[in-house]
From Swiss-Prot:
Keywords: Cell membrane, Lipid biosynthesis, Lipid metabolism, Magnesium, Membrane, Phospholipid biosynthesis, Phospholipid metabolism, Transferase, Transmembrane, Transmembrane helix. Its cofactor is Mg(2+). This is Digeranylgeranylglyceryl phosphate synthase. Prenyltransferase that catalyzes the transfer of the geranylgeranyl moiety of geranylgeranyl diphosphate (GGPP) to the C2 hydroxyl of (S)-3-O-geranylgeranylglyceryl phosphate (GGGP). This reaction is the second ether-bond-formation step in the biosynthesis of archaeal membrane lipids. It is a multi-pass membrane protein. GO terms for molecular function: geranylgeranylglycerol-phosphate geranylgeranyltransferase activity; magnesium ion binding. InterPro entries: DGGGP_synth, Prenyltransferase_related, UbiA_prenyltransferase, UbiA_sf. GO terms for cellular component: plasma membrane. Gene3D superfamilies: UbiA prenyltransferase. The chain crosses the membrane at residues 21-41, 42-62, 96-116, 133-155, 162-181, 214-234, 235-255, 266-286. It comes from the Archaea. It comes from Haloquadratum walsbyi (strain DSM 16790 / HBSQ001). One of its GO terms (biological process) is glycerophospholipid biosynthetic process.
Length: 286
């Protein structure tokens, strides 16, 4: 295999951001488990997880295509700016991944398929229309991230499970916080491209205050399952540290936005683990 082919394959792999795609699949599985415990249908959950991974990878690829000019400034080592994959190649590859995602949904209940189609439309709308609008792009990304949990629950026919709904809200709010901080980090490149992100429109300090306020709502929401008795003390022992990690992340964000984003992401995954443990304890009768 020659160097050019290896470089293209590496570029395609980087374009998918496999770590993020697999993480989204894990969140979908988490949603199914929180909603149904151990009584889940393997084929449905597998289809939902596969669809999430393919759709997330496709979304990353198409997002990089539309962001190719901005990434020359903000992230020059991404596959398209560094020349690892062509613009046309990125479009074709993302189309292949979207088809794989659609095929994966064929085993799912109708409600899950409808949710998948809604998310696909939201993703396309985000990349082509709303990404540069203040708050709107952040809200769409927040919804899409949180909806991975709903999708897992929908795959087993339990999309209205209260625990999953709270998890959706928590993840969406935490993601909104992270997206605003990311916009602060990308301020220079976004301004040069004429985007109207929240920090550009209202200023960095007000945007940071909005991000902090949104996260505080998420922290309050995370306690609700314990307060109303859905999950017990084992849930609380994990979700409180998760909240602390996210709060530290937003506190560090003004001085180190990259570190703040990483802590917010880690805190969200710890919170997801808290929901898994909370459901497992209930199912086991501990």
């Amino acid at each position: 295999m020659d160097t050019h082919v290896r470089g293209t394959i590496r570029g395609a792999i980087d374009l998918m951001r496999i770590g993020n795609a697999v993480a989204a699949g894990v969140l979908t599985f988490t949603g199914a488990f929180v909603a149904g415990g151990f009584a889940v249908t393997t084929a449905h959950v597998t289809g939902a997880v596969a669809a999430t991974i393919f759709a997330t990878a496709a979304g990353n690829a198409i997002n990089d295509y539309f962001d190719r000019a901005i990434d020359k400034i903000n992230r020059p080592m991404r596959p398209i700016p560094r020349g690892a994959i062509s613009e046309r190649g990125a479009i074709v590859f993302s189309g292949f991944l979207f088809v794989a995602a659609v095929v994966s949904t064929s085993v799912l209940p109708l409600i899950a398929i409808v949710l998948a189609l809604m998310n696909l439309l939201a993703l396309v709308a985000y990349t082509e229309l709303f990404k540069g609008l203040p708050g709107v792009g952040n809200a769409i990304v927040a919804y899409l991230t949180g909806s991975t949990f709903l999708f897992g629950a929908a795959a087993i026919g339990r999309i209205t499970d209260f625990g999953v709904v709270v998890l959706f809200i928590l993840a969406a709010l935490a993601t909104a916080t992270r997206e605003i901080i990311k916009d602060i980090e990308d301020l220079d490149g976004d301004r040069k491209e004429g985007l109207q992100t929240l920090p550009i429109v209202i200023g960095v300090t007000p945007a940071y205050r909005v991000a902090t306020g949104v996260l505080l709502v998420a922290v309050i929401a995370s306690i609700v399952p314990y307060v109303i008795g859905i999950f017990g003390i084992w849930y609380l022992t994990l979700v409180v540290p998760a909240d602390m990690i996210m709060l530290i992340g937003v506190w560090q964000a003004p001085d180190n936005p990259t570190q703040g984003q990483q802590l917010l992401k880690r805190g969200m995954f710890v919170a997801a683990a808290a929901f898994v443990v909370g459901r497992a304890v209930v199912v086991a009768g501990i």
